[in-house]
Amino acid sequence: MGFTVDVAGNCLIGDVRLVLEGGDQGLCAWSLDGIDSGGGIDGLATHRAFGATPAAPDRPAGGRHPNGVVAIDHVVVTSPDPVRTINALQAVGLEPRRTREHAAMRQTFFRLGPTILELVGPAAPDGDGPARFWGIAFTVADIDATGRFLGNHLGRIKDAVQPGRRIA
């Protein structure tokens, strides 16, 4: 998909280091700098990162990726009980910044440094299952160039809700 990955399986994207390991597909766990969760946050496998940052004085943050990705815009988590997941996130020191409710769905947003956590779930609890990682949204330098690079692997480019932004 056009990401630059080093021999140790690290992929630097902006201020975030993705560690690619074998096994399950998709986002399986995360490490949050300074957050001690005891191993999990409402079912989300969570490890504590101590001052981990890919940037160093002799190396700028992020890597150069042929797909044009320059940052992680947001990570999406789903939960059958968003209030329970919000409480779990607050218990480790994360505070909601904004909540949007429409129809039968609720979205709550948290800031994780330069990256946003978007929690999505039903407006009313719908089961007692754990929260799950659902997806990652990337920021690219030039969405048209990324579209040409990825071809059919990228959805249709369209205007975003935010003025002046486009998404795919």
Task: Write out the residue ranges for each language-model feature.
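Aromatic/basic-lined ligand-recognition segments
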Residues: 108
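Glyoxalase I/VOC metalloenzyme domain signal
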Residues: 1-97, 111-168
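Structural preference for solvent-exposed beta-strand-turn elements
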Residues: 101-104
